[in-house]
Amino acid sequence: VRRRIAASRSAARHNARLSTDAPTLNFWPMRPFPIAPIYHIISRLGLRVGHEPRDGQPAIAWETGTWVTSRQAAPLPHDAINLQCVDISKSKVERTWEEVAGYPLAVDPLTTAGRLVAKPEENARHGGRILSGPLKRRRKGWVYERLVDCLVDGQICTMRLMTAGGHLAVAYEKFRPEPQWFGGTRLAIPRTPDQLFSAQEQGLLRRFAAAMHLDYGEMDVLRDQSTGLIYVVDANRTPTRPPGLAEKDWASVYDLQAEAFKALLQPWGLA
């Protein structure tokens, strides 16, 4: 409840800085939290925060949970951003990645020998751990994945990629000390997609986002140091600012994100 109150107050403060006749982006079923990059985007684009989806106005399905139910989505217009992105569970990410990339992230923990990753199915649970397989049983509500070797000079290196309207706008290279595999990012460095991914890999990542129906959001990507292969391990339709991103980088990062987001507003003549 407190987070929803904070989101409502943040929206009111944002709207107070704009004229009442400024265009509106309707968020449903939730309003964004104050730390969400979407605030930097809509501030640059002069959009108010609305909470009453209606035809003729842009809307975005905004739910921080893992699934969006048909009941939650019912008030949204048929052309709402992220309307079809109703499942960002870890197993959905795994299935979609294997279908698009042609090689799996998921493993069978009952037959896999050696180290593997176990983590909760639900989004933003942050309960990942490294186990030694094979296991005797699966844990309900958990998924099991290969341990991607992303150690670079003693640092765990992960990548995050922002997408909007099929465009890969900006990436981050994130570092944290071993053995903090699942949290504790110390440094996030903005990169261009070209600096981190080949043209073929960028095409693969765009196809993954399309298969997830992720019109706007972010993907967490790992690169295996032994094979060079990339793996998408998480998809998020309500991104937050990555820890470790220096304030001096905010302006350039959010300028790029706002420019990419314009593509999603073209149907309403707001690009």
Model-derived regions, located:
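Glycine-rich, phosphate-binding/catalytic loops in enzymes
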Residues: 77-79, 133-136, 249-251
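Phosphate-binding site of ATP-dependent enzymes
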Residues: 129-212
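Generic beta-strand structural signal
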Residues: 111, 163-164, 223
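Protein kinase-like catalytic core scaffold
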Residues: 116, 169-170, 231-233
